[in-house]
Amino acid sequence: MMDGIRIDVLSVIPGFFDSVLDNGLLAIARKKGYADIVVHNLHDYGLGRYRQVDDSPFGGGAGMVLRPEPVFACVEKLQSERCYDAVIFPTPDARPFLQGDANRLSRMKNLMFLCGHYKALDERVRQSLVTMEYSIGDVVLSGGEIPSLLMMDALLRVVPGVLGDSESALTDSFQTGMLDCAYYTRPPEFRGMKVPEVLLSGHHAKIEQWRQENALERTRRLRPDLLGEDVE
């Protein structure tokens, strides 16, 4: 393949990724050679006859904790094969993952995503192996698989050549610090709802002005925090 991004994903449920990697943008990025995504089963590095990867937390309490040994074994094996720019752990107790983060990650060559599961990940893994932590929002999921896919999609769509129209990614929401404007397509009128006349005018300067004004209005109404304004 061409000199694309190598992404290794560590998970206790690797089959979760099968359908997603074979469809949509991630499949396109792989087919075009812009990404090489490999999923690793942490159970292959588990302990004992039953390949144990979790255990109860010290101090008691509900839930199970992902043990350090399988994670260290898998990460260190991969690190012996290549140098990683980042070992990423999606977790709700981290700063938000933003568009700027996706842009930065898209310029890296070797990334590793560590998908947590169960109640928690042993803290020693986070202290010793993880180099970046991101939250996708104030919500708790059953594992890091969905957040990892979200981040992979976000970073790969801004890699030049992945999308059919690279300019499309550059005009997305947040790329300019605001939400994107509204979009319309055919027909020009549907069930009494009309497309704004300016978009049908063919006057490019006026269309661009409308889009900027619409984006500003939508941002002020939906995400005033992006403009530094108070949120009601």
From Swiss-Prot:
Reaction catalyzed: guanosine(37) in tRNA + S-adenosyl-L-methionine = N(1)-methylguanosine(37) in tRNA + S-adenosyl-L-homocysteine + H(+)
Pfam families reported for this sequence: tRNA_m1G_MT
EC numbers on record: 2.1.1.228
Localization, UniProt: Cytoplasm
Single GO molecular function: tRNA (guanine(37)-N1)-methyltransferase activity
Entry keywords, A to Z: Cytoplasm, Methyltransferase, S-adenosyl-L-methionine, Transferase, tRNA processing
GO cellular component, one term: cytosol
GO biological process, one term: tRNA N1-guanine methylation
Entries under CDD domains matching the protein: TrmD-like
Residues annotated as binding S-adenosyl-L-methionine: 116
InterPro entries to which the protein is assigned, alphabetical: Alpha/beta_knot_MTases (IPR029028), tRNA_m1G_MeTrfase_C_sf (IPR023148), tRNA_m1G_MeTrfase_TrmD (IPR002649), tRNA_m1G_MTases_N (IPR029026), tRNA_MeTrfase_TRMD/TRM10 (IPR016009)
First and last residue of the signal peptide: none
Record-stated family: Belongs to the RNA methyltransferase TrmD family.
Assembly and interaction partners: Homodimer.
Known role: Specifically methylates guanosine-37 in various tRNAs.
Name of this chain's protein: tRNA (guanine-N(1)-)-methyltransferase
Organism this protein belongs to: Chlorobium luteolum (strain DSM 273 / BCRC 81028 / 2530)
Gene: trmD
